[in-house]
C-alpha cells in the first residue's frame, strides 16, 4: 500500500491539471501559432511559466485504485498487476481469465 500522502498529492495534481487545462491549451496554441507576434509569444510563455507546476498533466501519475501502487498499472482496468490478478482469480473482472495453453 502506498503512503496516503502520496496518493492525496497525486489526486491534488489531477484536480489542478483539470482546472488549468483550458488556460494551458490556449497559451500553448498561441506559442505554436505562426500568426502570433514575438511579443505575444513571450507574453504567453511567461504566463505559462507562472501557472502552478502541479497543473501540468505530465506530473500526474497513474495509480492502482485499490492499493495506490504507482507502477505496473493497467490503464484499461485502473488496477495494478497484483490487484488485477487477485480480481481475476476471484472472477470480479468479466471476460478475463488466466491464460492456459
UniProtKB/Swiss-Prot annotation:
One GO molecular function term of this record is: structural constituent of ribosome
Keyword Ribonucleoprotein attached: yes
InterPro entries recorded = Ribosomal_uS14, Ribosomal_uS14_bac/plastid
According to the record, the signal peptide region is none
What are the Basic and acidic residues biased-composition ranges? 51-68
Q: Which GO terms describe its biological process?
A: translation
Keywords for this protein: Ribonucleoprotein, Ribosomal protein, RNA-binding, rRNA-binding
Annotated segments matching region Disordered: 33-69
The cysteines joined by S-S bonds are none
Q: Which is an annotated Pfam family here? A: Ribosomal_S14
In terms of superkingdom, the source organism counts as Bacteria
Q: Name one GO cellular component term.
A: cytoplasm
Function noted in UniProt: Binds 16S rRNA, required for the assembly of 30S particles and may also be responsible for determining the conformation of the 16S rRNA at the A site.
How this chain assembles, per its entry, is: Part of the 30S ribosomal subunit. Contacts proteins S3 and S10.
Concerning its family, UniProt says:
Belongs to the universal ribosomal protein uS14 family.
| Name of this chain's protein | Small ribosomal subunit protein uS14
Tell me what organism the protein belongs to.
Xanthomonas oryzae pv. oryzae (strain KACC10331 / KXO85)
Gene expressing this chain: rpsN
